[in-house]
Each structure stands twice: as structure tokens, then as C-alpha cells.
Amino acid sequence: FIAELYGYLPELVEYFLTMFSPAETLEFIDYSDKPRPMVVRTNTLKTRRKDLALALMKRGVSLDPLASWSKVGLKIMESPVPIGATPEYLSGHYMLQSAASMCPVLALAPEPKERVLDMSAAPGGKTSYIAQLMKNTGVVFANDLKPDRQKATVANMHRLGVKNVIACSHDGRKMPKLFEHYKFDRVLLDAPCSGLGVISRDPSCKVQRTIVDVMKTAHLQKELLLAAIDMLNHKSKTGGVMVYSTCSVSVAENEEVVNYALSKRDIKIIDTGLDFGE
């Protein structure tokens, strides 16, 4: 009945019911139908959030600070102008970026002058945030399997005034061999996934994603995660920190992937010290 009411494949609803109670499943599916507010991230390489907010408000934009955990996010309530085409946007004063996609970068907590790898980077939202937190120092390798997608990454870096990023296109699984003598202080793997956590952004997932897709993706994620761990410099003062994130809610693509890595590599889970996701 839920599948029919909300337009989902029955097998997907059944899958959600293996993870959540019926009430939670209904709440999740209902919430997934609701549009998210537009969010922008202030580019502190070029401006301050206060100044950006004032500039946008002068253009008639209604906005609020994003949340207590973000010093750079702004939530756009209403706008008479296209947010992706204002003079401030074109000048690189902000990036369109969802609140959820800022969280992995905060968990990664990159420091100035470090070596950082963003393993699945395009179109560069997280990469540019990493560069911003590093104050344009050190080096960030922005990798993506598809060279065509990197055009957007490079364009965004130029617009935002980011100068410490190197864009490359490799199969992440092969990177440990390619970078045999070059290791990283921190690695972010925002892995390719089924997208079951962002159905509001892509409603086609309701009918196009199957359990087979979830399992195939989970297999790829396990390979990528091991490769990401192998890219870490264990002699780094950080000890080598990596963040694994997805935009899926499935246990197969999250907890099970992490448990697999814990069984295959000498690593431990560390507390981010952040209160979201509790």
C-alpha cells in the first residue's frame, strides 16, 4: 500500500522495512517527498558570511543562518533572483551546496598545509570547502572517474579563487598503485551510491533503484574504501584520517561497508566531535 501511495517499487519499501519500523519507514518516505530548502556555503577565501548575507538581502533574498554547527552556511527561504546567477555567485563568493554535503568535510577537518585527497570529487563542492578550510595552502587532489565531470570541478575552482587543487581522473580502486610513493594526511571518499537518501533531489530513484543495484554499489564501495585507506600516510601527524560518506540510507552501503574495512585493514573509528547524525 505504501509503495502504491508514494510511487515506489514494492521491493524498495520492503527493504526499508528491514531497516526501519513501519512508522519510521512511513516517516522517512513521507519526508523524502518534501523538497529541501536551498543552501549556499560562503566562500571565506573571498568574503565573510555576514557580508554575503547583506549583499543577497539587498537583492531581495530572504535567508537565515543554516544551523548552529555551520559558520558558513545560509538557508535561502525565498529569492526573486536566480541564486546560481547573481553577481556574488559569478564572483565566487558562494557555492550552492546542500547542508548534508558540508558535513563530511567538517568531519574530515582538514588543516592548512596538509595533503588531502577527495577521491570522488566532481563537481567540486566538497573539494572547494576543503581548500577553504586549508586557507588555500597545502595540496588537494580532486579525483573523479569521469573526465567530463571534472570540467565543472575546474570551473568551480577558478570561480571560487581556489589555488591549491589538482584535478585528476582515475579509477579510485587503482590509485594506490598510481600514487605508490605519494600518500595523504586525509582522504575523503564520498562514494558513488544508490542515492536512497536523496530521493527528494532525484525522485527517479523510487522506481529505478533495485536491491541488486544496492548490492552492486556496496561491492564497489568496499573496493574504493580499501583503496582510500591504502592512500593514507600512516606516519602523518594525523595518523592518516579518512572520512567515508554516502547519500544512501541503506545499511549495506554504510555500516556494512565500514565493518568490512575494519575487518580488512588495521584501522579504528574515531569520534568526529560533531553533534549531527546522532
Protein language model annotation of sequence segments:
Residues 1-278:
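S-adenosylmethionine
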